[in-house]
Amino acid sequence: MKTIACISGIFAALALSPMAQAMEVPESVTVPKGNDVAMETVGVGKIKWACEAKDDGTMGWVFKGPDAALNDADGKQVGKYYGPPATWESMDGSKITGTQLAVEPNGKGNIPLQLVEANPAEGEGHMQGVTYVQRLNTQGGAAPDMACDEAHKDKVEIVMYQADYLFYKAM
């Protein structure tokens, strides 16, 4: 059975803040010099978690993937983010996957900040030439704060989240 874990008020508060607001970015998720922001988006959506046995045999919440709209500063959808594998797709059909280089915790209940090195794009369009994707200003999305044991095996939880996704190109 699927349930929705609501995170009250975060989307309203973030809607009033500027995209990719000035924040001190930890060094571990800083994009290397020689790359400049080519596109800024706000991802708004959900992350699917399942209660199941982990690789070490213990029960726990296992990340199953995101499903989010990527919106521009005016709130217009310009792409989507989904997986697995983690895929960022522009409305023009071009898309990228990538290799996670680093994550940095961003508070209880929030998925971590992230730095991803992009693989070459599929298709022509906005994702062509993207070198890195940086996830900042994360709100929500972390594994559910509820029991995951044999009694809850195979339970699926959907957790809402929002984050800024910055796409970089070599300049």
Put a short name on every predicted segment.
Residues 8-17:
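Bacterial N-terminal signal peptides
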Residues 18-22:
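Sec/Tat signal peptide C-region and signal peptidase I cleavage site
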Residues 23-46, 55-171:
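Primary mode marks residue(s) on the alpha4-beta5-alpha5 output face of response regulator receiver
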Residues 1-8:
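Bacterial N-terminal signal peptides that target proteins for export
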